[in-house]
Amino acid sequence: AYKTVLKTPSGEFTLDVPEGTTILDAAEEAGYDLPFSCRAGACSSCLGKVVSGSVDESEGSFLDDGQMEEGFVLTCIAIPESDLVIETHKEEELF
């Protein structure tokens, strides 16, 4: 499992994300309420921004390459590849 720090508007939370599990699924299992809508990488409701670490978003993403290079990720499809620090609730920053 990878240690993942979620920086949310209501505080900072740390959880272990099992290998192959998305950030959103792991957060929900741990009882954290992150925003989401489609759960399929096709919208930006669940948008987060990686501060440190890396994720696999090969499932296909609504984001373009430039947005991904800036560190934006869709937590519903992003699978940690290392320990992570991620800021959640970032949808407003995209537009």
From Swiss-Prot:
SUPFAM superfamilies: 2Fe-2S ferredoxin-like
Cross-referenced PANTHER family: FERREDOXIN (PTHR43112), FERREDOXIN-2, CHLOROPLASTIC (PTHR43112:SF3)
Protein's recorded name: Ferredoxin-1
Organism for this UniProt entry: Equisetum arvense
GO CC term (a single one): chloroplast
Cofactor binding notes: Binds 1 [2Fe-2S] cluster.
Family: Belongs to the 2Fe2S plant-type ferredoxin family.
Main localisation: plastid
GO biological process, any: electron transport chain
Subcellular location: Plastid, Chloroplast
Keywords annotated in UniProt: 2Fe-2S, Chloroplast, Electron transport, Iron, Iron-sulfur, Metal-binding, Plastid, Transport
Cystine connections: none
Function according to Swiss-Prot or TrEMBL: Ferredoxins are iron-sulfur proteins that transfer electrons in a wide variety of metabolic reactions.
MF terms in GO: 2 iron, 2 sulfur cluster binding; electron transfer activity; metal ion binding
Residue sites binding [2Fe-2S] cluster per the record: C38, C43, C46, C76
Cofactor(s) required for function per UniProt: [2Fe-2S] cluster
Domain (2Fe-2S ferredoxin-type) ranges: 2-92
